[in-house]
């Protein structure tokens, strides 16, 4: 009887580490990147790891808050929002390029805009059809709007009295290159990767200004992972990210897709300026 009872007892399923990211680029690239990363983390951490895509930036923050995602690649602003909504979270890592990240302003060939030699020339955007990326994007909206404001350009000064919101950096580039918008802002790493991939026609679109640097993307882990997966598990995730080695094929592919040479440690205070700007522009309350 005892053996029968034991046989009937349900087998407890091994917990799955659910990873996610803000959808800042096209879904095909994201599925490839995070699919490979899930395999790498699963191999290093010895637990099942699954990539769970989300529809928009706000959904990434919400899924993290509710526990639908355990580990998320956030932008600067969304990471701050997530940490404020989910006490006890931990910032783990950023890319080598994230400590001094930049956005670029781009313009279509038909816009008449030429490369700016100083930030004051951002005033030339007044009256232009202009698009940001996602409303919650750090590099595609928050910091570009901040620098515009510092140089006397309000969003109400743009054509139609407001900007467009393309939803992603790739979409911003496509819309400006097609002429649907005369100008826009996106993160420089995405611009560079598209140029490298041959997806930019420099006769139709060009960079007109680059922002000063600021801190941006970072990995954030939910609280309670050590309780679910074992003591020290959050530290193990951090080490798995920091140990990605460009000399190993799978790690090299991951780093290439991230546009980085390595991941480095990060901490919440790196994003204090982003929080201050977010509050100033009403994106954090």
Regions found by a protein language model. Give the residues of each.
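Short helix-initiation/N-cap motifs at beta->coil->alpha
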Residues: 51-62, 75-77, 155-174, 215
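Ligand-binding cleft/hinge of the Venus flytrap
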Residues: 36-46, 139-165, 195-201, 276-284
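An extracytoplasmic/periplasmic, membrane-proximal ligand-sensing/linker region
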Residues: 14-17, 25-36, 220-221, 225-285
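A conserved helix-loop-strand patch within extracytoplasmic ligand-binding domains
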Residues: 95-151, 157
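Short beta-strand->loop
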Residues: 89-98, 158-162, 195-213
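A ligand-binding cleft/hinge motif common to bilobed small-molecule-binding domains
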Residues: 73-86, 149-150, 175-178, 182-202
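A bilobed periplasmic-binding-protein/Venus flytrap-type ligand-binding module shared by bacterial periplasmic
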Residues: 23, 103-115, 215-229
């Amino acid at each position: 009887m005892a053996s029968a009872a034991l046989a009937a007892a349900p087998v407890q399923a091994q917990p799955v580490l659910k990873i996610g990211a803000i959808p800042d680029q096209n879904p095909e690239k994201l599925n490839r990147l995070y699919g490979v990363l899930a395999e790498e983390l699963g191999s290093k951490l010895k637990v099942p790891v699954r990539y769970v895509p989300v529809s928009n930036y706000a959904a990434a923050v919400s899924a993290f808050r509710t526990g639908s995602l355990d580990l998320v690649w956030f932008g600067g602003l969304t990471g701050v929002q997530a940490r404020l909504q989910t006490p006890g979270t931990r910032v783990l890592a950023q890319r080598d390029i994230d400590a001094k990240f930049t956005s670029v302003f781009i313009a279509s060939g038909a816009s008449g805009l030429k490369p700016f030699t100083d930030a004051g020339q951002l005033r030339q955007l007044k009256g232009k059809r202009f698009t940001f990326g996602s409303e919650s994007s750090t590099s595609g909206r928050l910091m570009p709007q901040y620098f515009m404001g510092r140089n006397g350009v309000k969003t109400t000064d743009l054509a139609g009295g407001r900007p467009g919101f393309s939803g992603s950096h790739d979409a911003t580039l496509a819309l400006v290159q097609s002429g649907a918008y005369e100008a826009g802002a996106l993160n420089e790493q995405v611009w560079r990767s598209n140029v490298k991939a041959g997806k930019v026609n420099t006769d139709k679109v060009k960079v007109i200004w680059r922002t000063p640097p600021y801190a941006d993307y970072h990995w954030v882990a939910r609280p309670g992972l050590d309780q679910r997966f074992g003591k020290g598990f959050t530290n193990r995730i951090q080490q798995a990210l920091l140990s990605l080695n460009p000399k190993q094929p799978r790690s090299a592919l991951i780093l290439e897709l991230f546009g980085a040479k390595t991941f480095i440690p990060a901490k919440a205070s790196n994003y204090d300026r982003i929080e201050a700007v977010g509050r100033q522009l009403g994106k954090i309350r």
